[in-house]
Amino acid sequence: MQIKEPLRVGIGGPVGSGKTALTLALCQRLRNVYNIAVVTNDIYTREDAEFLTRNEALAPERIIGVETGGCPHTAIREDASMNLEAVAQLSERFNPLDIVFVESGGDNLAATFSPELSDLTIYVIDVAAGEKIPRKGGPGITKSDLLVINKIDLAPMVGASLEVMEKDARRMRGERPFIFTNLKRGQGLEDIVGFIEKQGLML
């Protein structure tokens, strides 16, 4: 039996930016529409996988937690074999799988997904890290298919200007899209779903 190749969506970003919150929200929004699964990456635990299971993102057998050890961005870039194996397992188990979300371990602004592992990349940063984050650049900011600027509700508390962040994101990314979100309240989620469907599934 031929195994369908799913759309692989890489979700990256610094620790605490909202990667797992985005993965959870996307699973809850899309699980009744598409056949989906998740691969998470943690250095020494399966904490993100357990969080998603606990919050009933998907059935537990649809979530594989990869323990990367050492440097988390190596597992999504230079040596993606563990992640590729997890994607292959899920593709076989739930054939025909539509989408696999691959969430990276907490990484820095220089981390990117291997093209072997991800068809579409979403990079999540958060307003609480300061308005200067978009202009710091790095491949996640400049080269990802979609930049998500999360936790916009915190802007007044940390003295961050969304206007400045928007201007810097536009300057750093050129034509590449970015979306402001408050994932706790679901704000911006539909725009992300629309992007995945249009760019990845060609709907």
Curated annotation (Swiss-Prot):
Pfam families: cobW
Any one Gene Ontology molecular-function term assigned to this protein's record: nickel cation binding
Principal location class: cytoplasm
GO process terms (BP): urea catabolic process
GO cellular component: cytoplasm
Keyword terms of this UniProt record: Chaperone, Cytoplasm, GTP-binding, Nickel insertion, Nucleotide-binding
SUPFAM superfamilies reported in the protein's UniProt record: P-loop containing nucleoside triphosphate hydrolases
InterPro entries the record matches: CobW/HypB/UreG_nucleotide-bd (IPR003495), P-loop_NTPase (IPR027417), UreG (IPR004400)
Residues binding GTP, per UniProt: 13-20
Cellular localisation: Cytoplasm
Subunit structure: Homodimer. UreD, UreF and UreG form a complex that acts as a GTP-hydrolysis-dependent molecular chaperone, activating the urease apoprotein by helping to assemble the nickel containing metallocenter of UreC. The UreE protein probably delivers the nickel.
General function of this protein: Facilitates the functional incorporation of the urease nickel metallocenter. This process requires GTP hydrolysis, probably effectuated by UreG.
HAMAP family linked: UreG
Family indicated by similarity: Belongs to the SIMIBI class G3E GTPase family. UreG subfamily.
Protein name: Urease accessory protein UreG
Annotated gene: ureG
